Amino acid sequence: LVLVGFACEQKVQVEPVAEKVTSPDISNKQQPEITINPFSPVDVSPMDMSYFPVDYPKIKMANANIPPPVARLIYSRPHLQRRALFNGVLKYEEPWRLGANEASEINFYKTVTIQGKKIPAGRYIIYGIPHPDKWTIILNSNIDSWGLKQDASKDAGRFEIPITNNDISLEYFTMVFEKTDTGAASFF
């Protein structure tokens, strides 16, 4: 790894320019539609994070001496853009990296138990395989791999999650944690 930096201490005199500055025309760019998302406010930036406990960064700012969070999800937020989710974006029985641009990552700051299986503290990519009646969610230790070719030999755990349907159509993919009586659940 080679890092190169340049600095200059010369003073440069800049003459003011009396030119009219106009904003670029963005009328031909896609503008986000107003959508309702009952799970989390939508940040239209391509990257998002979810913590457990929820709002951990705010809690830490109020008290710097608290322990690390239990988990953090980092993902790029894809959206449908009027496409059909299945047969348009995803296919049943094929892996999806649960996000756009990069492999989504989950970091556990301590050992957690998911469906009775202990997962050691660490950083994992998280991806899923959709089936008509359930999803297989996979935690994999092959980090920094962009998530396009999964190496099953590095799976830390596979979990079958039944599908729950609702009547809400969401434009933006969202992953959030929610506190439960037994710990936390993550919703996609």
Indicate residue ranges for each PLM-predicted region.
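Sec-dependent bacterial lipoprotein signal peptides
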Residues: 1-6
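Short, exposed beta-strand-loop hairpins at the edges of beta-sheets
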Residues: 186-188
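Mid-length scaffold segments of soluble, non-membrane domains
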Residues: 91-149
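Extracytoplasmic
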Residues: 68-70, 101-103, 119-121, 132-134, ...
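Post-signal peptide N-terminal segment of mature Sec-exported envelope proteins
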Residues: 17-42
